[in-house]
């Protein structure tokens, strides 16, 4: 048995959509816990316990779950995704914020962005919520260093 902890958008039909890949690859659903009372940031935590007979099928199920928009948090209690809150200080907008986001999205996903622009001549700041695979954190931190040098920005990281 495999326990998969995911997060889904809090809207009708999301749970049904993630059950399709499980069925498609012949896995059996043992249990589902849909914790709406623990909703955070418009996302609902869901724990699905499945019985699947080989690792290739599990890999395909996980890939399809992500294609369906599920954020896979843990597999059998092991972290798969890490959330980072990153404060970016500098001329965030003037140094092409779209490019910065696109480059981060090649490694992880900028899930949320709050931008503060006090005055066009002054530095701005942004708070980014980034979701990244645990094994790609070092690559993301290296990108932050590149962006700091290239764009004169400062990235302040917080992992949870």
From Swiss-Prot:
InterPro entries named among the record's database cross-references: ACT-like_dom_sf, ACT_dom, ACT_ThrD-II-like
Show the PROSITE patterns listed in the entry: ACT
Where is the ACT domain positioned along the sequence? 3-80
One family from Pfam that matches here is ACT
Q: What is this protein called?
A: Uncharacterized protein MJ1601
Q: Which organism is it from?
A: Methanocaldococcus jannaschii (strain ATCC 43067 / DSM 2661 / JAL-1 / JCM 10045 / NBRC 100440)
